[in-house]
Amino acid sequence: MESIVLIGFMGAGKTTIGQSLANKLKMPHLDLDTALIEKIGRSIPDYFEKYGEAAFREQETQLLKELSKNTAVLSTGGGIVVGPENRSLLKSFQQVIYLHATPEELLKRITEDTENQRPLAIERSSKEIITLFESRKNFYEECAKMTIDTTNRSPEEIINEILQQLKE
């Protein structure tokens, strides 16, 4: 089976769904953010603070290139679609799944997730986060071969829909 790439805004469920989907398909799961932390040797918020978003996006692009050689379920960071080079890379995969949720649902998940510090959500208002989502939405849609709505759905329901659509 070819790689499956999960894209979507922060809080869409990419890591949660990626891990479970990989288990179901008996494939390795690669989380781009986790791999980036290992590569850069510090947390993403620390890296953002010290080097800025542009430097972070460069690291992200390099890692996406490296990981694209593996066959796995790949959970990406929410901003992976920002760079044109990344969008080209994403379009080269056969299975790119956009995990979509309403802005209200995303805000709820982001604010309730105390374990995950999201540098682009810290110290931003709800309105600013929604504006950020809206600025990326078309890029997610442009890169996706499949869109799955995750709003008010359990991980199991989402995975079952993905598996059903992969069979078709």
From Swiss-Prot:
Which CDD domains does this chain map to? SK (cd00464)
Which regions span the lipid bilayer?
A: none
InterPro entries this protein is in?
A: P-loop_NTPase, Shikimate/glucono_kinase, Shikimate_kinase/TSH1, Shikimate_kinase_CS
The lineage's top-level taxon is Bacteria
Tell me which EC number(s) this protein carries.
Answer: 2.7.1.71
Instruction: Identify the cofactor(s).
Output: Mg(2+)
> GO cellular-component terms in the record?
cytosol
Q: What is this protein called?
A: Shikimate kinase
Sorted keywords for this record are: Amino-acid biosynthesis, Aromatic amino acid biosynthesis, ATP-binding, Cytoplasm, Kinase, Magnesium, Metal-binding, Nucleotide-binding, Transferase
Q: Main EC class of this protein?
A: transferase
**Residue numbers binding ATP:** G11, A12, G13, K14, T15, T16, R118, R153
Residue numbers binding substrate? D33, R57, G78, R136
**GO function terms (MF aspect):** ATP binding; magnesium ion binding; shikimate kinase activity
Which gene name belongs to this protein? aroK
Per UniProt, subunit arrangement is: Monomer.
Q: What does this protein do?
A: Catalyzes the specific phosphorylation of the 3-hydroxyl group of shikimic acid using ATP as a cosubstrate.
State the pathway, as annotated in the record.
Metabolic intermediate biosynthesis; chorismate biosynthesis; chorismate from D-erythrose 4-phosphate and phosphoenolpyruvate: step 5/7
The cofactor note from the UniProt entry for this protein is:
Binds 1 Mg(2+) ion per subunit.
Q: Write down the chemical reaction(s) this protein catalyses.
A: shikimate + ATP = 3-phosphoshikimate + ADP + H(+)
